[in-house]
């Protein structure tokens, strides 16, 4: 097996077939990924995680583990919406991965100083499925009691938020960083700011162990490196298994595909 991306699966080809073979092996790429993941579940502190994307259900287990391990959590992407809602901010017509109200309320109460949510967002109206056709773009600042209208969606973190996130990182002297999921609608150039700022934070903290993973955040970081003519390797280590990364963290590395290889 040479793919972290499938190790969380309980499929027969991943977790059962290796048990029938006398000769099983962990691939070089998978070994590299595991070494990176071990540095996340046994982090050098202080540590920070930038969590974006949409599906809370894919990230909530890892989020809890990261908090328990002392990580500062910085929220972006549509992941921001249930957290904003939990603090009674009006999220208008923004996408919401529902069903997590209770656990998010508890996390915000238990780790209020560790979970950082946006204070401003960039919004727009999406009247079709074409992600390039977003109209009436504007910023909404929650600290000024501004609200997202029912016909609007939050599509990126705002400049005040990313400034605060950057300042927090600088103040803490972060030694371990991870990013999973984009901070905005990166398919549309108007909403790449948040993801680009995360990439810039990674670039400016070369003293830290840095790993980012997931198709969209990898794409966002690659766009950043090309647009600003920066060597992508200067942004840290790229993991090709976004959900695999999350499941490794959530389960402390105890994944079906790895158990089958007896590599832990």
Q: Which residue stretches match the model-derived regions?
A:
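Active-site loop-to-helix "anion-binding N-cap" substructures in soluble metabolic enzymes
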Residues: 1-264
């Amino acid at each position: 097996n040479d793919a972290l991306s499938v190790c969380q699966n309980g499929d027969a080809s991943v977790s059962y077939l290796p048990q029938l073979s006398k000769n099983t092996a962990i691939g070089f790429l998978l070994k590299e990924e595991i070494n990176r993941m071990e540095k996340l579940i046994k982090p050098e502190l202080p540590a920070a995680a930038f969590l974006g994307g949409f599906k809370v259900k894919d990230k909530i287990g890892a989020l809890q583990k990261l908090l328990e391990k002392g990580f500062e959590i910085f929220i972006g992407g549509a992941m921001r919406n249930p957290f904003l809602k939990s603090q009674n901010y009006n999220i208008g017509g923004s996408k919401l991965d529902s069903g997590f109200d209770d656990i998010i309320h508890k996390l915000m109460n238990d780790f209020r100083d560790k979970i950082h949510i946006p204070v401003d967002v960039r919004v727009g109206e999406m009247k079709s499925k074409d992600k390039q056709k977003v109209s009436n773009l504007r910023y909404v600042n929650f600290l000024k009691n501004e609200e997202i209208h029912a016909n609007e969606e939050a599509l990126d973190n705002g400049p005040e938020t990313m400034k605060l996130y950057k300042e927090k990182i600088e103040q803490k002297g972060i030694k371990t960083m991870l990013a999973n999921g984009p901070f905005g609608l990166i398919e549309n150039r108007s909403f790449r700011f948040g993801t680009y700022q995360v990439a810039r934070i990674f670039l400016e903290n070369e003293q830290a162990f840095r790993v980012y993973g997931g198709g969209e955040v990898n794409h966002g970081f690659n766009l950043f490196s090309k647009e600003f003519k920066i060597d992508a390797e200067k942004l840290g280590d790229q993991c090709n298994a976004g959900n695999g990364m999350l499941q490794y963290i959530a389960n402390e590395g105890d994944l079906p595909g790895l158990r089958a290889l007896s590599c832990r």
